[in-house]
């Protein structure tokens, strides 16, 4: 009798569609659909058709960082509670390897020849953030950001005082300069400091070094040159590793690390350590990371836009396009990319100002190919007219 009642009740649950996510078998399958395999898909984005957890995904072709994060994520069965370790140590690997000289020490010297670091880690369960910006003399930027998250009630520390905090937490102070970064700076100064980030100053920043002073022209008569083609973003000039890790229980962390824009004005901070700009995570929805022209991208909070677009029902690939299209409406010459992932492990990417954008993914769908490289072709100027 009781057995018949249980069978009847189970059948009713199935018919009503109220079976919980935990009782639904997970589909171990992820295909980044290339632009050539699905005609209906725009050439601006790529997306998985099914979720697959746990997973790690990061910007650019930084496979070693992804592989380490993937190993850490699977230290315990299902990667449970390992997402923070995975993201922090994955990005740390890139800092140590000086990935393309755009992450970590010894790259992207500012106008004075100094390398400074920006990094962030965000917890999608608590919405807590730890970040550092303009970090001087400390190599472990994202580990310091983790200490901000775990040992303070703040969200961000900056500059020399961030470095003092790091030393108090046990981090070693050392020079971030290398022979390569010094040579990079010397070549730049020998070329009359070209290109640079100055405008509306004298002497003319397009042909000479500073020091500069503001023009006396009234503000209403200033002509702003918004073109940034001198700083086209791509291989060897893309600034940031952004990484997302999700475990089998849908716990999410997202993080970034960068040494910023090459030859930046000292004191400049880009999008990488800014929540909603460089990265954003919310366990209820998913996460997103961004890379590219940070000075422009941070004005639009593209990773927050992507997560909120997924909350509103858009698929990850569509959500990644939201911020990209919003930015390209105002800045035709910007270059950048966004990766979006929902809480089930479905992912997508969109980019602009480049031919294509590579990224790296690890998940259970292809255990024989961990840290596999995938790419997406970018939105063109004509496609970007259709702003979301």
From Swiss-Prot:
Recorded superkingdom: Eukaryota
SUPFAM superfamilies registered for this protein in UniProt: N-terminal nucleophile aminohydrolases (Ntn hydrolases)
EC numbers for this chain: 3.5.1.26
Entries under Gene3D superfamilies matching the protein: (Glycosyl)asparaginase
The record's account of how the chain is modified after translation: Cleaved into an alpha and beta chain by autocatalysis; this activates the enzyme. The N-terminal residue of the beta subunit is responsible for the nucleophile hydrolase activity.
Residues that span the membrane, as ranges: none
GO molecular function: N4-(beta-N-acetylglucosaminyl)-L-asparaginase activity; peptidase activity
GO terms (BP aspect): protein deglycosylation; proteolysis
Record's keyword terms, sorted: Autocatalytic cleavage, Disulfide bond, Hydrolase, Protease, Signal
Family membership: Belongs to the Ntn-hydrolase family.
Name of this chain's protein: Putative N(4)-(beta-N-acetylglucosaminyl)-L-asparaginase GA14866
Native species: Drosophila pseudoobscura pseudoobscura
């Amino acid at each position: 009798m009781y057995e018949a009642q249980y069978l009847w009740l189970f059948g009713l649950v199935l018919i009503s569609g109220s079976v919980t996510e935990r009782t639904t078998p997970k589909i171990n399958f992820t295909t980044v659909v290339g632009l050539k395999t699905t005609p209906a898909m725009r050439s601006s984005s790529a997306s998985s058709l099914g979720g697959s957890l746990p997973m790690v995904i990061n910007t650019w072709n930084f496979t070693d960082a992804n592989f380490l994060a993937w190993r850490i994520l699977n230290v315990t069965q299902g990667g449970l509670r390992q997402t923070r370790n995975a993201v922090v140590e994955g990005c740390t690997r890139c800092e140590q390897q000086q990935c393309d000289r755009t992450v970590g020490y010894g790259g992207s010297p500012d106008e004075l020849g100094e390398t400074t670091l920006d990094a962030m880690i965000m917890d999608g369960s608590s919405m807590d953030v730890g970040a550092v910006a303009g970090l001087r003399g400390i190599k472990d930027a994202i580990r310091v950001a983790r200490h901000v998250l775990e040992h303070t009630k703040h969200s961000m520390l900056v500059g020399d005082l961030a470095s003092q905090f790091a030393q108090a937490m046990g981090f070693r102070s050392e020079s971030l300069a290398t022979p390569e970064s010094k040579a990079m700076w010397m070549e730049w100064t020998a070329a009359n400091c070209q290109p640079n980030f100055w405008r509306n100053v004298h002497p003319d920043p397009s042909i000479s070094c500073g020091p500069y002073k503001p023009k006396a022209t009234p503000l209403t008569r200033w002509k702003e040159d918004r073109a940034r083609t001198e700083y086209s973003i791509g291989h060897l000039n893309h600034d940031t590793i952004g990484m997302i890790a999700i475990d089998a229980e849908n716990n999410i962390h997202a993080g970034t690390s960068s040494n910023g824009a090459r030859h930046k004005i000292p004191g400049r901070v880009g999008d990488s350590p800014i929540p909603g700009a460089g990265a954003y995570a919310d366990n209820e929805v998913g996460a997103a990371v961004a890379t590219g022209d940070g000075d422009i991208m941070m004005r639009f909070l593209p990773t927050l836009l992507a997560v909120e677009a997924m909350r509103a029902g858009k698929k990850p690939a569509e959500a990644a396009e939201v911020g990209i299209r919003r930015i390209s409406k105002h800045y035709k010459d910007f270059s950048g990319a966004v990766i979006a992932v929902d809480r089930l492990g479905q992912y997508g990417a969109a980019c602009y100002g480049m031919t294509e954008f590579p990224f790296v993914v690890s998940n259970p769908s292809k255990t024989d190919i961990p840290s596999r490289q995938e790419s997406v072709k970018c939105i063109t100027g004509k496609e970007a007219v259709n702003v979301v």
